[in-house]
Amino acid sequence: MAIIPEIAPAPASGASRWRRFLTPWRSPADQPAWARPALLAMAALAAVAYVWGMAGANVEPFYGAAARSMSQSWHDFIFGAFDPAGTVTVDKLPGELWVQALSLRIFGFHIWALILPQVIEGVLTVLVLYRAVRRLAGPAAGLTAAAVLAVTPVTVLLSRGNVSDSLLILLLVLAADATCAALLTGSLRQLLIAGVWVGLAFQAKMIQAWLALPALAAAYLLAAPAARLRTRCAHVALAGLVTAVVSLSWMTAVTLVPSHGGG
């Protein structure tokens, strides 16, 4: 019986390697060819604007000290402690400070390491806003919305500081994106995901995160394709319950932890 030698696959040509390199940068088949390159270029420009001079940026010293303390102790990290002894907590929930503390734990205490999370959050917000608007109004409208957000002066300012607004905005835009997906499909799962995002936003800026709830709920009640209003109301109620559970999770956990004295 003749033995047929295995034929090694031909090495990829330069053209095929180039096509594979370009694939992530090309728009999906259902979008114009210019959509993804334009979005990525805009995100890159936003990133440059946000990081420009961030090593010498002014930061809030109170929250900077808290993030540093939290980066040095997991106990302080969990409880959002301001001081290394873990006796004083900050004046809000520590959602954004958790992200900053992780950055400091990885890179060390530097101003740029303190601001880096907000830069990333700002760029992600631009990308997610594009997707949310594109779902309902198309790529051109999505790109316009993303461009306006990217160049708004307050967006640049927040992305170059260490306050918690950047994380709040990102999470609420993620909630809006999930709600837009629910509007198109009537998906309860997407609406529950929106509730999770709002609950996480509560960890960043507390009750301010809930200000978006009436608009998100009204949009789903009025425009979702679910056949019966009763069904849509039930979906909104479940999403509200998820939001409440996620929002109150950290406060509940901290409240249930006994004090050192056991009292």
Model-derived features: positions:
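Membrane-interface transmembrane helices that cradle and orient dolichyl/undecaprenyl
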Residues: 9, 140, 175-191
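Short acidic/glycine- and proline-prone juxtamembrane loop motifs at membrane-interface regions
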Residues: 154, 160-167, 206-207
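Membrane-interface alpha helices of multi-pass inner-membrane proteins
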Residues: 190-205
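Start-transfer (signal-anchor) and selected internal transmembrane alpha helices
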Residues: 1-49, 235-243
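Extracytosolic helix-loop segments that constitute the early lumenal/periplasmic catalytic or substrate-binding loops
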Residues: 62-106
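Transmembrane-lumen/periplasm boundary regions of multi-pass, lipid-linked membrane glycan transferases
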Residues: 21, 26, 59-69, 73, ...
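Transmembrane-helix motifs of polytopic, lipid-linked glycan transferases
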Residues: 116-136
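Transmembrane-helix signature of polytopic, membrane-embedded enzymes
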Residues: 40-45, 129-151
